């Protein structure tokens, strides 16, 4: 029964952000763990000299994991300038994009200024000038605005439960299923395995491939209650 309620939260969150499939919802401890998961799993498959683009107004959770991965895998990080009103300099972003750009990860709503970048416009620019994955920090955005990941055209979204009036210690990373399927897990053990041998192991299907250890049943169910509350008061008001 508890497992059923836990899995029901995936479906609730899928509908809340209009994801394609509930299996695309990965539970984490929050945005910080989400960015660490993505940076560790994605960057290991990049080439030396490949580039990551962030902005000058990012939360530390969306900077430090990329810095650590860049140092480990010899990648380069570039930062989009912001103007005096803390808006992203779109012309500067265009100048940074190249064939070496593999990741663009930016904030959806700034916790510093309240700045709301035009995500659809930025995604279109990024995709037209590179083959980069687009990652959105939704910590402040998702609790306050209606978010449709299909409409935005993004590849990954990180969310923290406590920002959504839910419990601490729970969050979500949404990603396109074909991307999750192509990525390696970061943590090992528990139900993330399918079969274990003396010399190797095979992984469970997504989403469980990325959820090692005992699941956060209580926290996830609490997050589901927060999603219900936000849905009932309408995200468009």
Regions found by a protein language model. Give the residues of each.
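Pyridoxal 5′-phosphate
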Residues: 1-237
């Amino acid at each position: 029964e508890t497992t059923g309620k836990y899995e029901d939260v995936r479906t609730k969150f899928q509908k809340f952000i209009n994801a394609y499939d509930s299996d695309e919802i990965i539970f984490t401890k929050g945005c910080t763990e989400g960015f660490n998961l993505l940076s560790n799993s994605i960057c290991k498959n990049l080439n030396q000299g490949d580039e990551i683009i962030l902005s000058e107004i990012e939360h530390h959770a969306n900077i430090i994991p990329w810095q650590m991965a860049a140092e480990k895998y010899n990648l380069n990080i570039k930062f989009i300038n912001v103007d005096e009103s803390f808006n992203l300099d779109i012309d500067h972003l265009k100048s940074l994009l190249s064939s070496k750009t593999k990741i663009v990860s930016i904030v959806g709503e700034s916790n510093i200024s309240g700045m709301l970048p035009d995500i659809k416009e930025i995604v279109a620019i990024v995709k037209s000038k590179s083959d980069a994955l687009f990652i959105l920090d939704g910590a402040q955005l998702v609790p306050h605005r209606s978010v449709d990941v299909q409409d935005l055209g993004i590849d990954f979204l990180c969310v923290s439960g406590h920002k959504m009036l839910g419990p601490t210690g729970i969050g979500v990373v949404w990603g396109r299923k074909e991307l999750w399927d192509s990525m390696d897990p970061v943590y090992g053990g528990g139900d993330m395995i399918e079969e274990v041998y003396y010399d190797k192991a095979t992984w469970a299907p997504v989403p469980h491939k990325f959820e090692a250890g005992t699941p956060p049943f209580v926290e996830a169910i609490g997050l589901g209650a927060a999603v219900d509350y936000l849905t009932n008061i309408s995200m468009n008001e």
